[in-house]
Every structure is written in structure tokens, then in C-alpha cells.
Design a protein with these regions (language model features):
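Sec-dependent N-terminal signal peptides
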Residues: 4-15
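N-terminal binding-site loop/beta-alpha segment at the start of enzyme catalytic domains
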Residues: 20-91, 142
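Active-site beta-loop-alpha junctions enriched in small/polar residues
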Residues: 44-46, 68-70, 96-100, 128-131
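Residue-level recognition of the N-termini of beta-strands and the immediately preceding loop/turn
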Residues: 89-93, 123-126
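Glycine/proline-rich, positively charged
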Residues: 102-151
């Protein structure tokens, strides 16, 4: 059975829900044993009020937060996470490494910047944003290195 991860863009939408119902969102068990919510909130094109919107999304029950360095809002997303008051371990944070960062040292710098900007010790899922030919294996190996370090 295929499961589709639905990213809900709640910005500007009138969504009425309660956190108790949102906590019933089904999860997908990943190969490493982690549970990933099937419903999350995306932060693409969210700039000025990203912290407020992320905080609100978490307070109404969203637990998967999707962002990327290329969105230019990881600091604000991290601020929203902190403001929510929800324990980090209850959240599933996804970010992305830009194609332009797909080289040894720059991958590490990119990941370290994301960790710092998000204000977290670890990221649950890191994707390669628009992977292109070349450096994919090297980038993948560095991502595995960060997993082994618990980051």
C-alpha cells in the first residue's frame, strides 16, 4: 500500500480543528524505525510571519514541519517551534540540502547551518533539494555520517 505524505498549507486558510484530533494523524514507520506523521505543514513562501504560523500550526496539532534552507526562513521556523512550547521530541522536522551545497565541506556547512538556524540538535529528515547528476553519492554519505552522529 502506498502512503502519500500530505503537506497542508494552512497559511491564509481558515482551518478549525483541535489538537486532540490532530494527534490522531496516522504515521508511517520508516526503515530506521522512526514514525513520520502523514500530515504536516509546509513553510515554502512563508517569510515575515513564519514563526507565528509555525507556532500556531504546532499548537493546533501539526507535528511534521517541512522547511528548507532555500526557503530562507529556517530561523523563523525554529523560533516558531520554540514558541510553541511543545517538546522537540514530539515533532518531526524535515529540511533540505540545496543542490548548490552538494559537495563535501559545503554539505556539512549547510547541515550545521540548518541545525543552528532551527535551534535543534537533530533533524528528523534531510532531503536533497532537486538532486542533479554528480555529488549525489558523496552527499548521501555525509547525510549518513550525520545520522550516525545523531544529528
Amino acid at each position: 500500500m502506498k502512503t502519500i505524505l500530505a503537506i497542508a498549507f494552512v497559511w491564509g486558510m481558515a482551518i478549525q480543528t483541535n489538537a486532540q484530533e490532530m494527534n490522531k494523524v496516522p504515521t508511517v514507520k520508516l526503515n530506521n524505525g522512526m514514525e513520520m506523521p502523514q500530515l504536516g505543514v509546509g513553510t515554502f513562501l512563508v517569510k515575515d510571519d513564519a514563526a507565528e504560523r509555525v507556532c500556531h500550526a504546532i499548537k493546533v496539532g501539526f507535528r511534521l514541519i517541512d522547511t528548507a534552507q532555500g526557503y530562507g526562513n529556517e530561523k523563523e521556523v525554529g523560533e516558531g517551534i520554540r514558541r510553541s512550547g511543545i517538546d522537540r521530541r514530539e515533532l518531526f522536522i524535515t529540511t533540505k540540502v540545496n543542490t548548490t551545497e552538494m559537495r563535501g565541506g559545503t554539505v556539512r556547512q549547510s547541515l550545521d547551518k540548518s541545525l543552528a538556524d532551527l535551534g535543534t540538535d537533530y533533524i528528523d529528515l534531510v532531503l536533497i533539494h532537486w538532486p542533479v547528476k554528480g555529488h549525489i553519492k558523496e552527499t548521501w554519505q555525509i547525510l549518513e555520517e550525520y545520522v550516525d552522529k545523531g544529528k
